């Protein structure tokens, strides 16, 4: 669910913050099109991911606000004949309020598309991060060395370790 997803983003953001603090002054090459372009800091580089994931979190929160309305009492689309205080029931169930229009309540699924979009954006940002982990762990870059716990051996080269978790997540 959206709340759980935000929790995972919070954990990831905390890790990114720690990395930024630890590497605030550490210089690294900045790249454009996989070519060295200009110097930057590791903190600045991770700051880009921080901004991406903050926007992702914000999108989830915005979507939650729009989804937190109760359709109870909307019926098939024209409401119900039962004497129901929809606002009171909505509040008791923890919703912000009852939906305004019963037809819209039961016939539109835009909230699903919005939530899937949020998840797609998060996936894209995670994929980008995982791709960098793979690159940075490669022999060509050599910026990081992942623990054997997060690596698997190569089928063809016995001395090479692959960042399999990152590849699968990507």
Question: Locations of the language-model features?
Answer:
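Internal glycine-rich alpha/beta core junctions
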Residues: 17, 38-160
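Single conserved hydrophobic/aromatic residue that forms the stacking wall/gate
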Residues: 157, 161-170
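Histidine (H) residue identity feature
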Residues: 23, 33, 44-45, 125, ...
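Long, non-coiled-coil amphipathic alpha-helical linker/lever segments
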Residues: 1-38, 99-111
């Amino acid at each position: 669910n959206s709340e759980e997803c935000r929790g995972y983003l919070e954990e990831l953001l905390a890790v990114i913050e720690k990395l930024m603090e630890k590497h605030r002054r550490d210089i690294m090459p900045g790249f454009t099109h996989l070519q060295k372009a200009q110097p930057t800091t590791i903190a600045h580089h991770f700051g880009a991911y921080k901004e991406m994931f903050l926007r992702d979190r914000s999108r989830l929160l915005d979507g939650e606000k729009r989804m937190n309305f109760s359709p109870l009492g909307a019926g098939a689309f024209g409401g119900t004949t039962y004497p129901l205080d929809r606002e009171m029931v909505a509040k008791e169930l923890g919703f912000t309020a009852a939906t305004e229009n019963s037809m819209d309540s039961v016939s539109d699924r835009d909230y699903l598309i919005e939530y899937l979009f949020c998840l797609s954006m998060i996936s894209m940002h995670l994929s980008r991060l995982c791709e960098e982990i793979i690159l940075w762990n490669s022999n060509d870059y050599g910026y990081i060395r992942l623990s054997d716990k997060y690596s698997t051996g190569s089928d063809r080269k016995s001395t090479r370790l692959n960042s399999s978790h990152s590849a699968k997540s990507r």
